[in-house]
């Protein structure tokens, strides 16, 4: 379950923003990473734990504790933000840019290539989504292990290679010059995992119930445990990716 939750959390933004921190923070990298971890790991953990411990049936039920109009507004705003407004387009464009754009003919019609890739990408996503009962198998047992294997190879190869310039002597850029912690803090929030945790938490609850755990207290404890393990692992990945990016300048 923790592996599945990690796979749900770790999307395009989880590679973009730690990489940017490594490239721009320079010698202020560690204070920037601390800020990144607070909002990129700490807030998602609190979100998953809140949904599990509240024993709510979903985001709408949780936000209904304020009142129903607020619940409708907050639920719609959150799903639009982590869905069609920001996160969904980012997943397709980053996958295309990182995975295909560099090997396609540079004199070709990139907009057409992106359109075709996007259609194929979201058709595949739709096929997975139509079988929610298989999400633990597809994400937790198949996609996530392959992703971690390839990412691990990339991180190890980069970290064992000597850096051209020591990170401690690299000048920071942009907001990392004066406010590295705050800039990293904002970058961690930009992953949008703090918002996504409120949506993913109910998926964890449903999967735990499908595994035969029905007692509310046990469901809450197992949800919190899944959140802790997945977020700790995500934090380790953030540190590794940031360090890798810093060494590859």
What is each of the regions a protein language model found here?
Residues 2-10, 80, 157-164, 173-244:
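Hydrophobic, membrane-embedded alpha-helices of multi-pass small-molecule transporters
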Residues 35-63, 75-89:
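Juxtamembrane transmembrane-helix boundary signature
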């Amino acid at each position: 379950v923790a592996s599945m939750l990690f796979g749900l959390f770790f999307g395009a933004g989880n590679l973009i923003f730690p990489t940017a921190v490594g490239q721009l923070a320079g010698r202020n990298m560690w204070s920037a990473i601390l800020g990144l971890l607070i909002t990129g790991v700490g807030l998602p953990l609190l979100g998953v734990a809140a949904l599990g411990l509240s024993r709510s049936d979903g985001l709408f039920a949780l936000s209904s504790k304020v009142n129903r109009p607020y619940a409708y507004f907050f639920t719609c705003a959150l799903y639009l933000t982590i869905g069609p407004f920001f996160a969904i387009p980012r997943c397709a464009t980053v996958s295309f840019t990182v995975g295909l754009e560099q090997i396609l003919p540079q004199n070709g019609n990139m907009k057409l290539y992106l359109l075709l890739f996007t259609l194929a990408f979201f058709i595949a996503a739709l096929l997975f989504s139509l079988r929610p009962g298989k999400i633990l198998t597809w994400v937790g047992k198949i996609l996530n292990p392959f992703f971690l294997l390839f990412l691990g190879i990339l991180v190890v190869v980069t970290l064992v290679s000597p850096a051209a310039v020591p990170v401690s002597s690299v000048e920071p850029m942009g907001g990392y010059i004066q406010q590295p912690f705050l800039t990293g803090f904002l970058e961690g929030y930009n992953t949008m995992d703090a918002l996504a945790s409120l949506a993913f938490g109910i998926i964890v609850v449903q999967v735990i119930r499908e595994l035969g755990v029905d007692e509310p207290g046990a469901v809450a404890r197992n949800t919190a445990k899944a959140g802790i393990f997945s977020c700790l692992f995500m934090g380790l990945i953030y540190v590794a990716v940031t360090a890798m990016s810093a060494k590859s300048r």
